[in-house]
Structure formats: structure tokens, C-alpha cells
């Protein structure tokens, strides 16, 4: 059998392959930041939505050896609901999902729990082992945005920037 996955989750080799391939995002960002400012600013804060974690890893990769501050925003689910897709910010415990130890949403028996988010791309019960490490070592901070906050951010960005972001980055805009 073979596992095909499009995020930085699962056994280590899949995490490495996906993180390497998405790192082009941060390589390009590093070039653009240096062109804009002449050098890398002393203070830089990089925010990104986090589901499985590949987008954020791609965005942050080239900045890991700098003093950049990383903030990941998970899917907090609907307000007034206990369901969410935010294992790092809602007290989830370590479990095994897709062959990897990670923070994972679990039910009372330790089975994979239900999730809910307006954003299909963030609606995942686990999180990359890389993000678990970044959280535990305090290299990155994590928070969550509710479905309603993401929708409000979507409307504001659409109105003021004249672009229509997907629901995933709308969580980060919130």
C-alpha cells in the first residue's frame, strides 16, 4: 500500500516532502521582503491559517532561522458549538493519526473526534508534527478564529482590498 497526502501530516518522509515542496512560498517571500526593505527587517510577524499545516510551513520555512514571529490560526468552528478543528488551541491531547503522533481531537474513548469548520481546507482533526514541535518549543503561537469571524474577515478583505480570499486565509485575516 501507499499513502498519498497533500499536507505536512503522516510519517516523517511525507512531512519532509510536503514541507520541502511548499517552501517555495517562503523563498519567494524572503526575496520580496529583502527587495522591499533592502534587508530582512528586525521585527517581522508571519500569520497563516493552519489545518494540517502545509500552507503555514511553506510560508514560514525560510524564516525559521530568523527572529520572525510565527502565528498560526486554526479553525475554531461555529460560535456556540463545541465542534471545531483547532487541536492546538483547544486542549487536544497527543494521539496517533495517519501514522504520526500529534495533537489530535479525540472523543472520551481516545478515538478521532468530530470536527466542524466552514473551511474544508482547515477541517482536519490533527495537525502536523512540525506544528506540534513549534507549539511545544514556543517557537510559534497558535490561536483560532470562528466561522463567523472568518466570514466577517472575508467580507472586509473583499470590500477594502477588492479580492475574494478563500475561507482558509480568511481565518488568518480574522
Region locations from a protein language model:
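A glycine-rich, Thr/Ser-enriched phosphate-binding loop motif common to dinucleotide/cofactor-binding enzymes
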Residues: 10-29, 166-171
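Short catalytic-loop micro-motif centered on adjacent basic/acidic residues
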Residues: 45-48, 142, 163-166
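Active-site/ligand-binding loops adjacent to catalytic centers
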Residues: 1-12, 17, 37, 65-67, ...
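Buried hydrophobic packing segments
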Residues: 25-29, 59-63, 154, 172-174
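Phosphate/pyrophosphate-binding loops at sites that engage ATP/ADP/AMP, CoA/4′-phosphopantetheine
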Residues: 30-41
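C-terminal structured "cap/appendage" subdomains that terminate the fold
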Residues: 158-174
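Short glycine/serine/threonine-rich phosphate/pyrophosphate-binding segments
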Residues: 49-60, 80-82, 169-174
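A short, small-residue-rich loop immediately preceding and capping a beta-strand
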Residues: 42-55, 70-73
Amino acid at each position: 500500500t501507499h499513502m498519498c497526502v497533500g499536507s505536512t501530516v503522516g510519517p516523517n518522509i511525507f512531512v519532509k516532502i510536503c514541507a520541502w515542496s511548499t517552501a517555495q512560498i517562503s523563498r519567494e517571500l524572503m526575496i520580496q521582503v529583502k527587495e522591499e526593505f533592502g534587508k530582512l527587517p528586525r521585527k517581522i510577524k508571519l500569520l497563516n491559517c493552519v489545518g494540517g499545516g502545509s500552507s503555514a510551513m511553506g510560508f514560514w520555512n525560510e524564516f525559521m532561522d530568523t527572529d520572525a514571529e510565527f502565528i498560526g490560526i486554526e479553525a475554531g468552528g461555529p460560535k456556540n458549538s463545541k465542534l471545531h478543528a483547532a487541536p492546538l488551541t483547544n486542549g487536544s491531547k497527543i494521539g496517533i493519526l495517519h501514522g504520526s503522533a500529534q495533537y489530535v481531537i479525540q472523543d472520551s474513548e481516545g478515538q478521532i473526534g468530530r470536527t466542524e469548520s466552514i473551511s474544508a481546507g482547515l477541517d482536519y482533526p490533527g495537525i502536523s508534527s512540525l506544528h506540534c514541535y513549534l507549539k511545544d518549543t514556543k517557537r510559534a503561537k497558535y490561536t483560532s478564529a470562528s466561522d463567523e469571524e472568518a466570514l466577517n474577515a472575508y467580507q472586509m478583505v473583499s470590500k477594502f482590498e477588492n479580492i475574494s480570499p478563500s475561507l482558509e486565509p480568511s481565518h488568518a485575516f480574522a
